[in-house]
Amino acid sequence: VLSAADKTNVKAAWDKIGGHGGEYGAEALERMFLSFPTTKTYFPHFDVSHGSAQVKAHGKKVADALANAASHLDDLPNALSALSDLHAHKLRVDPVNFKLLSHCLLVTLACHHPAEFTPAVHASLDKFLATVATVLTSKYR
């Protein structure tokens, strides 16, 4: 459960990300594909090379979904319901991949915003991403 401080930290972090969400999302995906090559199996139709237009487009989708979630912290299940259905029933993404992408996103954010990426912000973002992953996998059962 996100505390009031966590919610404040998450909102502040996403405000700081601003117009860089797509860029950071793509970078996190690239980092995931390089660090965890098995994740590429979910994107057989993608060019997963550095700078790929498909990776950039999907990175923007990921960032936009997370920005939407960050603006609906008190109602994540409803805010993410359609994405949960998509990932559980159509795409059938292994839930562990959400954790891998979350880790890569945290690394990306830490690289771009080291001064703002305090231990408290790191913990809040980690809890937020874990909560998002839990919601996205809630319809797998």
From Swiss-Prot:
Tissues in which the UniProt entry reports expression: Red blood cells.
Post-translational modification N6-acetyllysine, affected residues: K16
Residue positions, PTM Phosphotyrosine: Y24
Alphabetic keyword roster: Acetylation, Heme, Iron, Metal-binding, Oxygen transport, Phosphoprotein, Transport
Domain Globin as annotated: residue spans: 1-141
Binding site residues for O2: H58
Gene Ontology MF terms in the entry: haptoglobin binding; heme binding; iron ion binding; organic acid binding; oxygen binding; oxygen carrier activity; peroxidase activity
One Gene Ontology term from the biological process aspect of the record: hydrogen peroxide catabolic process
The organism's place on the tree of life at top rank: Eukaryota
Complex formation: Heterotetramer of two alpha chains and two beta chains.
Family: Belongs to the globin family.
Entry function: Involved in oxygen transport from the lung to the various peripheral tissues.
Name of this chain's protein: Hemoglobin subunit alpha
Organism, scientific name: Ctenodactylus gundi (Northern gundi)
Gene name in the database record: HBA
